C-alpha cells in the first residue's frame, strides 16, 4: 500500500520542473540496463539517460554480443529517446560482474572490485573494446550520445582508452 501511495504521488509531481529551492534547474537522467527500459524514461518524464550500463548485454547473454547486435541495441535506445541525451558507459565487467562462460578472462584477485575490471579489462581485451566502441560510434549518428569509461584510475588509462576510441573512429 505504501508503494502504491508513493507511486501515485510520484506521478503527480514528475511533471513538475526539477528545480532547487534557489532556482537552479536539475536534469533528471535515468539509469538503465536494457534497451527496453526506455519507455520508463519517457513515462516518468526523464530528460535522458545518465548511465546506460552496457555490461548487461554481456551478462544477460550466453555468448558475447557481436558489434552489430550492440549497435542495434544502442541505436534503439538513442532513437527512442531522441533528442534526449544518452550516456553510454563502456563495459564494467569484472569484480562483481564476470562474464558468464568466460571466467578464464577474469583472474582471481584479492580485491576484484579495485583490480582487473572495467577499463583495465577493456584495455587488455582490445578486440571486445573496439567492437563496443565502434557500435557506440555508429549509434551516435542517430542521436545525442555521450561516452563514459568506468573505473579510470589515472591519466594514462584515459589516454589509452581515447587512443583506442580514435582508432575506431578512423576505422569507420
Where are these regions (language model features)?
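Conserved glycine-bearing catalytic or ligand-binding loops at nucleotide- and phosphate-handling centers
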Residues: 1
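Conserved alpha/beta-domain cores
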Residues: 6-172
